[in-house]
Swiss-Prot record:
Keyword DNA-binding: no
GO annotation terms (biological process): translation
GO cellular component, one term: cytosolic small ribosomal subunit
Basic and acidic residues compositional bias, start-end: 115-137
Its job: Binds together with bS18 to 16S ribosomal RNA.
Family per record: Belongs to the bacterial ribosomal protein bS6 family.
Protein name, as recorded: Small ribosomal subunit protein bS6
Record Pfam families: Ribosomal_S6
Sorted UniProt keywords: Ribonucleoprotein, Ribosomal protein, RNA-binding, rRNA-binding
PANTHER family assigned to the protein according to its UniProt record, in alphabetical order: MITOCHONDRIAL 28S RIBOSOMAL PROTEIN S6, SMALL RIBOSOMAL SUBUNIT PROTEIN BS6M
Source organism: Desulforapulum autotrophicum (strain ATCC 43914 / DSM 3382 / VKM B-1955 / HRM2) (Desulfobacterium autotrophicum)
Presence of the UniProt keyword rRNA-binding in the record: yes
GN (gene name): rpsF
Biased composition (Acidic residues): 138-155
Gene3D superfamilies: 3.30.70.60
Length: 155
């Protein structure tokens, strides 16, 4: 098994639902051909270096996966046949990888990401709570100031 990276550019005018269906189709081809998806990174809309099909922008996507040459051939055949794909490019990252090691690496990265997301959510919750307490304290101070009469100078 080899490790590949494919970057493809889709039509930026596609609706999210159509784009997600397209992504699911490519992921399905990858699974059907026995590939292992390591990373699917949606880069979003970006300006193209030059117009493609009279479009100055494109929606970029990067897929990193393990598979065989037949998988790459099948993916690229589907890219060529689909009018929604403006450009694509596949490069070979590693010639020989262990599929089990790749699966373990993917699982470890997913676990690390979920831990990081949980820590971030915890930190956000603590920050919101601290801001709420501070706002409550500020309101209490303003109420106390409003209730106390101002001291007048005595002559």
């Amino acid at each position: 098994m080899r490790m590949y990276e494919t970057i493809f550019i889709t039509d930026p005018d596609l609706q999210d639902e159509v784009r997600n269906t397209l992504f699911d189709r490519f992921k399905g081809i990858l699974e059907q051909e026995g590939g292992i998806l390591a990373n699917f990174d949606d880069w979003g809309n970006k300006k193209l270096a030059y117009e493609i099909a009279k479009k100055p922008r494109g929606h970029y996507v990067c897929m990193t996966y393990g598979g065989t040459g037949t998988l790459v051939t099948e993916l690229e055949r589907n890219f060529r046949l689909d009018d929604k794909i403006l450009k694509y490019m596949t490069i070979l990252l590693e010639k020989d990888i262990d599929p089990e090691a790749l699966k373990l690496q993917i699982d470890a990265e997913a676990a690390a990401k979920s831990e990081a997301d949980a820590a971030k959510a915890e930190a956000d919750a603590a920050r919101v709570e601290a801001e709420a307490k501070k706002a409550e304290t500020d309101e209490t101070d303003e109420t106390v100031d409003a209730e106390t009469p101002e001291n007048e100078e005595e002559n």
